[in-house]
Amino acid sequence: STKQNPSENQQVEINISPVPVADSGFFLKVNTPKDESLADRKTITVSGKTTFDATVVVLTISTHEVVKPSRQGDFSTNITIDDGPNYIKIQAIAPNGEIQTVERVVSYTTEDF
């Protein structure tokens, strides 16, 4: 028979594929806030894009927000920041448990800039 076992075909495909098997296309892009930015308001918007089926978690020292992206993968949430530097961790968690993390530092100031 000239038929091949499907698992053998898959093994051959994996061996010759230029794309690593672990690359699921899962990503996280944060549009706002920019890293090391200054804010003159206590409330800032965290927004970006990821895969539509991910769960996005926005963490600061005082809060955590869980956000579901739109069908296009867009997400946005408002968080309250404290005086001085604020360390913000944005994580996208895929259904398979894969995690992408982006960190931002945003400083709150009442001074004109």
Task: Give residue spans per PLM region.
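Ser/Thr-rich low-complexity repeats and stalk/linker segments
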Residues: S1-F113
